Structure formats: C-alpha cells, structure tokens
C-alpha cells in the first residue's frame, strides 16, 4: 500500500474478477479515478483476522495489534471512499461483499470497464 503511494509513476488498479481482504487495502492505494474493475468483479471488505498462541501476555499483544490494524484499515477505507468512519466500522464487522456496481456506489472504484481501450489516456 505505502509503496504504491511512494512511487512517482501513476498507478492504475484494475479489479480482474476478485479483490478481497488485504487486496482491497492495496487497491485503495491508487487514487479513486485510477481504480477500475471488470464487470463481474467482486470486492470483499472485512476486519483483519489472525491467530494467537503462546503465553497470555503474547496473546494480548497480538489481539491489540489486530485491533490497531482494524482501525487503520477502517480509516483508510473511510478516507478513500468518503464514507463516515462509523459506517465503515459497521461494514467491516463481518464480511461485506460488493458487486462491481456496489463498489462504484461505495466509492471503492470510479467505474467499470469491459475493454482495455476504455482506460483513459491519462490512466
């Protein structure tokens, strides 16, 4: 995610059929006008998950890191979609699947394309 924003070359993200979980976070690194998908693409947003093991203190540390990651991801989704943070937090509480059309409405992508020729020259 940070590397996509760090490089100077313009990056266009194209959803090829399925953009889910951590891939959605990477997808949001590109500016909205450079986020597109194909018609049958499905998107999945949700809170992070993880496993923990070891001593109780280690488990508590890992749980806190997952909570921090959840907030960081929610803030990123809110910033990139324009959705209120409370709405995003509710949306990622469980798996939330979106069709290509729903992804446009949600603000994950700018538009749906069917052919490479539909990419703008500026993209």
Regions found by a protein language model. Give the residues of each.
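N-terminal organellar transit peptides
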Residues: 1-22, 28-123
């Amino acid at each position: 995610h940070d590397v996509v924003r760090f490089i100077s070359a313009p990056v266009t993200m194209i959803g090829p059929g399925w953009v889910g979980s951590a891939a959605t976070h990477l997808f949001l690194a590109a500016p909205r006008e450079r986020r597109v998908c194909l018609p049958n693409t499905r998107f999945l947003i949700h809170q992070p998950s993880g496993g923990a093991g070891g001593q109780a203190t280690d488990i508590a540390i890992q749980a806190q890191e997952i909570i921090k990651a959840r907030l960081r991801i929610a803030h990123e989704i809110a910033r990139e979609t324009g959705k209120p943070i409370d709405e995003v937090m509710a949306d990622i509480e469980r798996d939330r699947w979106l069709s290509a059309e729903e992804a446009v409405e949600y603000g994950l992508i700018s538009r749906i394309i069917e052919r490479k020729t539909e990419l703008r020259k500026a993209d």
